[in-house]
Amino acid sequence: MVYRSFVRVLALTTVVSGWTRLDVGSITSWQVDNKASPGAQQTSPTANPSASEIESNPWAKARPYFEKPFPDLRANVPELKGLAPATSQDPLTYILDRAGEKCVDLLSRIPNVISREEVTTLVPKPPRMGVSIEPYIGIQREKFDYLLLSKHTESGTKLEEYRMVNGRPATTATALGQLSQGFTSEWLRIYPGNRSESRFRYLGQQMMDQHHVFVLGFAQIPESVRFPARFQLPGKEVAIFLQGVMWIDSRDFRILRMREDLLVPRPDIGLKKFTTTIRFGEVNIAKAGSSLWLPQEVVIEWEFKTQTVQRRHRYSDYRLYVAKAKVLPATP
């Protein structure tokens, strides 16, 4: 059994250097039950949206973009340029099963790791402000240590992610967007026990980053998602459901890239777009015993009311994390 507590947060905060600061991100906690088979149906404390919530929101009758004609799909996802469209859905189950096996294997081996993270947030200047040499209202660059803890117990495995500044958890008082996290475990979306929360479509084959890849589309099923992403606005919290595309290496069935979009825009709250693109890569860590598969870069773009914002996360120098403890003599 795998269950996930996953919250994306969009919150208006302060004004920084003349532009409104937007904190966007996710808090992610994965729990994997060692006693359940990898393909078992998930069971967990439910946090599903209510029936009234589903009926009152636009995703109730949402049509994923992978159901649209191919030219429209490619317009939604420009990264699909060069895709050879699938003529059959027969390979879908095989691809999902093999990719799921990779998730199970990685989860069993992943240790506590830490990396360097560079975060750049850009707020482009709206067109109404005219042409100028500086195309951005605000630019902010920050550096962190990004920590992924893998806790193996008799009841299961739990993945927790933290952003650190000088050895302490980052907070909004010291860093912009401290909630933008959750990327290193995003591949668990296709863990066998999680597949029932989404619909999948085999889209075809493509060359991506010099790899031959299988391309899959996915869309969350609102009534099946136990812990939907939720956007938090002043005095209001709304559920958000996602669709996307994943590019899976045809040689070893590891995810090379993932793209996630809103299942439908939310004009009722001013959220027109929220797109996350994750690029994964092989990471060789000394003393880890084998290679891992972790994010190299994450790009988030969103349009909220009148602002368009882009945030880029780059990860490097992955290494084992070992907590240090210091024994102090007893005070007389």
Regions picked out by a protein language model, each given a short descriptive name:
Residues M1-Q31:
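Sec-dependent N-terminal signal peptides
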Residues W30, K35, G39-Q243, S250-R257, ...:
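Structured extracytoplasmic
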